[in-house]
Amino acid sequence: MKQGLTRHWAAVPLMAALAIDGGTALAQTATGKGGAASGPLAMPADYTLVWSDEFDKGALPDESKWAYDTGMNKQGWHNREKQYYSGPRAENAALKDGRLVITARKEALTTQADWGGQQYTSTRLITKGKAEWTYGFFEIRAKLPCGQGTWPAIWTLGSQGDWPASGELDILEHMGQKPDWVFSTVHTTSGHGGHGVGDGRKLATACGGFHNYQMLWTPKEIRFGIDGQAHAVYPNLGKGTAQWPFDKPQFLILNLAIGGDLGGEVDDRIFPIGYEIDYVRVYQDKR
């Protein structure tokens, strides 16, 4: 496993682990170990803004804040994904009307030295080496793409060590094949891939409008929510780094994958298709 930048899902994908039935998303773990949550989720009053991108300057993503992750293009990305992630290229990532738009396209960039045979292009942006955080309140306002085969995500990876030992926090994952559902999941040595800990929430307007996807990460727990309402929680059980590697920095990732274990079969009629991010904001307790 390459340090920090890649992940493998278990043979049983997340969709199977979450077991959607009759409009209810079932938590992946027993009560007390994490899973479903409810109630309000708000930024603590004593937190202050420490990092943000409002996507209101320039034409392309700010490379003082973001790097383009293209490292697995030649050999192919994990999870059987079908996209080629491009470098700086307005066709795949551009700033428009104060928003970042990540666009997936049906095209093959055969002239690129790292092309691995992919028939789709997209972008994966990371803050690794530019901005990393331990604890905080994260808020990303986004409108998700809806199309069979899309797999947009907002997530973090540990910057120290390999996956899953360094941890992964999926603030949001969405699959075009389940357009009314969004998911948040935590991956660690003690539970990863199809055995990650988290829950899903039905959100009928996930594709139709903007929503605030949120994570409150403290030394005691990690809580995920949408528009100020919590839906998943992961507690620190005091069982060591296998269960809680989250006392070390994580970096942020924004990407739009195509196909793969969660994206599913791809409908080529959906392209080009865009994933819009209005802003990314990180707050911390700086007292």
Residue ranges and their predicted role:
Residues 23-26:
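Sec/Tat signal peptide C-region and signal peptidase I cleavage site
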Residues 6-7, 20, 172:
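Residue-level micro-sites within transmembrane alpha helices that shape
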Residues 11-21:
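Bacterial N-terminal signal peptides
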Residues 28-287:
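GH16 jelly-roll
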Residues 1-12:
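Bacterial N-terminal signal peptides that target proteins for export
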